[in-house]
Amino acid sequence: MTLASPLPLHTPADTKRVSALTYAVASAMRRHNAPSLGAVDQAWLEGRPQTLLSLLDTTVAASAAEPRDEELVAACLWLLANQLELIRYKLERDYDWASVVLDAYQENLIVLARAQTLRSEDWFALVNLLNVAKVPIRPEMSEALAKAALDATPPGEALSPQGIPAEVSRAVDELGRSAKDPFRVVEELADIGMLMPVELRAFITHELGLPSHAVLREAVPLLLLDPEPVVRRSAAAVLEQIASPQTFSPVMLRRALLLRNWIPEEERAAIDRLVRKARVKGVECAQWAPASALSIQCTIVDGSGAQSVVLTTPTGRIGLFAGLLLKQGFGVRDAWCDLSVPRREITRSLKEARCEMAWRMTGRDHLNTVVQHHIARGLALGNLPQLQLLEIAEAIGAADWKDRSLDMTAETEQLLAGSCAAATSPAQIALSLRRSGEWIDRDPMVQSWFEDGAAVRALVDKRPRLKPDVALRRVLEEVLPARRDAWAERLVLLALWLRDSTEDALPAELSQDCLVLARELRAGRPPAELPAMVAIAERSVFVARVHAQ
């Protein structure tokens, strides 16, 4: 399989090392029942994104081998999912090659389907990795993959009398008989319907509300968070149709009420109608469980605008272990929730995480503020929260999470007004700006604070190559002014993180300095006059030059 991109092609040496890695991961799975990869190997994979296609070749070979080594196949799929996710991160930072590599992966899937060299379940597993890694699929690529899936379907499996593929109809019926949890139903439906036309998915959504399987009906409110508007509208329509005590449970009503505030404004009237009908018909709303004790740990906002939150129950042999990835420019990027994790696993995972990033304990007020802010920012960009956010909200009693975006200007002034000694005079402001510049330049906690977008890379890659001082000046004059609001938001989120930390306090002036810098940025002060932005620009040029080598 080949790759047309600015990246080097994957070499025989890459293929050999990839093969060795898959066997190492398979061996770890046999010993510990869990995949793992050493830091050196992980770094090598990150530095060789073109090995995605070597991994795909290796996975295909392992899947088709006789006898088949299931651990080896599982190891290949795990590595593929990891590599797809790493490349998706680069795609989000506007690396042109990332789109080329991900398209090449999908094009090779189409070739595999046409050649029919794999069992259909193995091919669908490779396709589903795109869903696992949250890789966006272009509409034309989705259409091509769907056609490839149809071509690979045996002739007798085409359509049921209702127009649903027979295999899908059987899978949905099996879900109704075996599933106990509506959240798992939706996850399984996402896997089944990934390559379906959206109109067919909407039809299936409507049908879920009608059968005798209660768990399928319970899943319909969760589809109000589906990425596709037509599926969400279908879910709202069938819920209104079945809104009576016999078919619409109190939990379904509670979930519909919460999710109303997580979907676009223009879709909320349909939720209001079904809620009114349910109440008129006598459906009672399920009560929320009392908020339990909660340990909340939160990272600093990194240079990509990402902030991770981990939630655990502080006592007991087993407990809640949940997490969120909040992302500037996206919203709630990821969420996961497990209600019963052994305490030793929670402790080990938290210890490992703290070795990699700056974490601090925060409280519920901070959690509520940042989650609701990112729900709102995500909605403004057309990105609905993941379904697992609902699981988390129900687990911790977050009954009031809505789309509440922070007004960054007002928040900055409010936080500054509450500080002990707000910088107001020109001399105080200059001192504060100098301190923030020194901190951002030297503190390892913010070493990821730099620009890594296409604009910086274009300057660094320019031929003839710009002198360092010229590149720095152009980043300050051409790149950072367009990013001032993003950096101001990042600084306010950092100030909130510092204010609400329940651990030992960092220097008292640090939060104030962040807010002063945010205020100056939003006021339009040139980045070249702000020592912190000069430090960010210098680091941006340095990192871009390193990556260009």
What do these predicted ranges mean?
Residues 1-222, 229-234, 238-244, 249, ...:
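Non-catalytic terminal/accessory regions
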